[in-house]
Amino acid sequence: MPELFGHTRARVAARHALITPENHVNSTVPGITGATAAVLINPAMGAGFAQTLVTFQVGGRARFADAALETFGYVLSGELEITLAGRRQHGREGAYFFAPPGHVAELANPSAGTQVMLFQKTYVPLAGVAAPEPVLGDVARVAGQPFLGDPAANLQVLLPEGPAFDFAVNVFAYQPGGHLPFVEVHVMEHGLVMLDGEGVYRLEDDWYPVRRGDVIWMAPYCAQWFVAMGKRPARYLYCKDVNRPVL
């Protein structure tokens, strides 16, 4: 249903944000050609990372090569070729890659309209621990586990959990009526995109109906809670910072 004139579900607050597909405005981003790039979260709003939606035309390309930045990409729709660390993967919906600092990731030969969601941040080294290795994967090959024993909430962990990795990316799936078991308040910052379904997200003292394509930023210690609603399961992809000293 179209939005009412002058109305939006989007909101940018001091410690959280909801950005909906109806609000996207494209930017020009170095390294991305033959595609549009909507920068949905970045430090301009107070975040410690960037989250960008790339929509490719036929012949579009993207190249990520930075000595300090790490890049995670997830194919939301369509298909393309992913090249990373000498390996090439034909990626369809659910394929993903992780390029640590100093590694080159290239995306090429997309079908028209292919969409990739990117999470990018400056890598934080850990003394005595080598940098992480590149990752190519597919969510369909990742086993899920009931979250805290609840079969209505299933968690898939997409990256290794060792100390080399300073952030995690997971997929959370809920059956209709499934929900987080309590309101979370924690140090980890989140970027999130709804993959399927719909529900209600509590962010601090506000409650937001959310659906496929919506993007959420949650600052550290932002109170948060989710319940899946409607007739079908809900899923979201999210990142968080992990494995680093508290000070």
PLM regions and their residue ranges:
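A short, N-terminal "cap"/entry segment at the start of jelly-roll beta-barrel domains
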Residues: 1-48, 111-167
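Conserved short histidine dyad/triad with adjacent acidic residue
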Residues: 20-21, 33-39, 50-67, 155-160, ...
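Ligand-binding loop in jelly-roll beta-barrel domains
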Residues: 45, 88, 101-126, 211-212, ...
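Glycine- and acidic-residue-biased ligand/ion/polar-headgroup-sensing regions
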Residues: 58, 68-85, 187-205
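Short acidic-glycine-tyrosine-enriched beta hairpin
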Residues: 72, 86-101, 204-220
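Structured core of small recognition/catalytic domains
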Residues: 157-247
